[in-house]
């Protein structure tokens, strides 16, 4: 895992109990309830720590998720749309987060803008099924990916801030 701040943030996310995916209609409702409670707690903790960095919502079934994530670099906010589907084998298989507008801009991304979490995150997820959920995906997957990739993409000139795009 990462630094002390990440460890602390993750330790404050409630662990999930229900081992169910979208195929199991009745238990899936219970799993979704746990997912939402963990996400709400994680977002509340982030806001308290002045580290608010994403918004996430789902379709009615809880199988398609979308929202925005952002990264502050040199006091400029870089904001991106994100999306992912819950795999039918969830929670055994972690979702693959896509940031479509960054597609093709980094080697740490698959076709369609799906971020690469294979080396570091997926083994951690596999060891923690079914306790890890979407809040853990954000904290241990997307958050660290943004922290590494966005400054690199900015330094290479592959992404620019909205205010700098017009000039």
From Swiss-Prot:
Superkingdom is Eukaryota
Q: Which UniProt keywords apply?
A: Ubl conjugation pathway
Name the residues annotated as catalytic in the UniProt entry: 116 (glycyl thioester intermediate)
State the signal peptide span. Answer: none
Query: A single Pfam family, by name?
Result: UFC1
> What are the annotated GO cellular component locations?
cytoplasm
The biological process GO terms on file are: protein K69-linked ufmylation; protein ufmylation; response to endoplasmic reticulum stress; reticulophagy
The UniProt GO MF terms for this protein read:
UFM1 conjugating enzyme activity
Quaternary assembly: Interacts with UBA5 (via C-terminus). Interacts with UFL1. Interacts with UFM1.
Question: What is the name listed in the Swiss-Prot or TrEMBL entry for this protein?
Answer: Ubiquitin-fold modifier-conjugating enzyme 1
Phylogenetic lineage: Eukaryota, Metazoa, Chordata, Craniata, Vertebrata
